[in-house]
Amino acid sequence: RKYAEESSTSLANAYFEIVFGTPDMPRITEEDITASGTDTAIYVIARASGEGKDRTASKGDYYLTDDEEYNISLIRRRYAKVVVIINGGSVIDTAFLKSQNVNSILVVSQLGNVGGHVVADVITGISDPCGRLTDTWAKAYDDYPGKDDFSSNNGNTDDEFYKEGMYVGYRYFDSFGVEPAYPFGYGKSYTDFDIAVAETALDGEVFSAKLVVYNTGSEYAGKQVVQAYVSSPEGSLDKP
């Protein structure tokens, strides 16, 4: 209530502004680096995500802030290994991270109250990062076909009408040959897997397959996400 009064806004707007707000990230100093006494830096990029808010093409939202770029550039020069953790439930721009050649990027999404324990287990090798992306991470904001329909871009906050039709997510990128930064289903592991097709069957309109997944690594246990994709033959109907 106090924030709403000071900001001359409604209680509802005040609630969402606080929830979706992200505190400013201080700049890392040489004193911080000296005091760390390690050759590895772990840097966390935090983004709020939730209902009723699309990514905006602005710094601190889809793009990194000036302070985030400064910090990442500094630690990349001063540390032998740099791990970037993206703590947020939606995509952000990764072009700067790639330009800095960070050693790894760990997307943790929104893990809830046990998120810290989970991240610690993955970083220390207790658990394998077996998850895969459920979104397509584009190389550029303009590559998303629905960007013009985002409420932050067209000002329509009451009703939203997206025009991609069936070409949502990876369907658009795959169908129209738009190369993403990271495709739908992308992910790396501490180990390697081989997948063998043991049996396939077609019963009417139902297709089934039995697979055998082998962990071919020698050091880490892990889980593999089996992904199957179907493409439709070209015809008179619009199909991905």
Where in the sequence are the language-model features?
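C-terminal non-catalytic regions of proteins with extracellular/luminal or membrane-system context
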Residues: 1-240
